[in-house]
A protein has these predicted regions:
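Bacterial N-terminal signal peptides
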Residues: 15-26
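Conserved active-site neighborhood of the chymotrypsin/trypsin-like protease fold
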Residues: 52, 75-157
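N-terminal activation segment of mature serine protease catalytic domains
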Residues: 31-72, 79-82, 91, 140, ...
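Bacterial N-terminal signal peptides that target proteins for export
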Residues: 2-17
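Gly/Ser-rich catalytic serine loop of serine hydrolases
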Residues: 63-72, 130-136, 152, 181-185
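Active-site region of chymotrypsin-like
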Residues: 42-48, 53-55, 60, 122-132, ...
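Residue-level preference for beta-strand/loop junctions
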Residues: 65, 99, 156, 178-180
């Protein structure tokens, strides 16, 4: 075999190896993008109409106000959210990511002490194209994390990436209790 033939074969092998490597990176990127899309689709915007009790005249309610918050689809066709999002709610709606339609929802469980609540949507098919997100282990400090949600004042999904710099007990305003909280930098 001549030097030119060996050079051509080795160039072809290197070309195939580079192409295969790029393909692997593309597949990994595609898998990562589809996983991110599934997470984004499983984050729900929650709209509520709330009427808190008037503690000075307990037979009356304060004027209703509207607010919004975030929730995540979990197993059992449930949406996990914070109790402060649905506390004193007389009307609850859920809106999927990139879907203008709002669906009537109802609270199925609330724990003010843990500031957690479960809601569901009875509309047939609401959960059919959504992936239930699992509840994982507590991340380690210095681990990169992503936070998805609809913070106050935002109409579109917010995604924040950062490093979990610490996890410690902090007082939660809703329950006036010490619970675990993480700081992301």
């Amino acid at each position: 075999m001549s030097y030119n033939n060996i050079r051509t074969i080795s160039t072809q092998v290197i070309g195939i190896a580079v192409t295969a490597t790029c393909l692997l990176f593309s597949l990994a990127s595609f898998a990562q993008n589809s996983e991110m899309q599934a997470i984004e689709d499983s984050v729900i915007k929650i709209y509520t109409t709330q009427a808190a009790p008037d503690y000075f005249t307990p037979w009356r309610l304060l004027n209703p106000r509207q607010s919004s918050g975030s929730g995540s689809v979990i197993a059992g066709n449930q949406i996990l959210t914070n109790a402060h999002v649905v506390a004193n709610a007389s009307y609850v709606q859920a809106q999927k990511h990139n879907d203008p339609q709002r669906y009537q929802a109802r609270v199925t469980f609330i724990s003010h002490e843990a500031d957690l609540a479960l809601i569901t949507v009875d509309e047939p098919g609401f959960f059919s194209d959504l992936t239930a997100l699992g509840i994982g282990a507590l991340p380690d400090p210095h681990e990169e994390v992503s936070v998805y949600g609809y913070p106050m004042g935002g109409k579109t999904l917010s995604i924040t990436k950062g490093i979990l710099s610490r996890v410690e007990q902090q007082i939660y305003a809703h329950a006036d209790a010490f619970l675990l909280a993480g700081q992301i930098d």
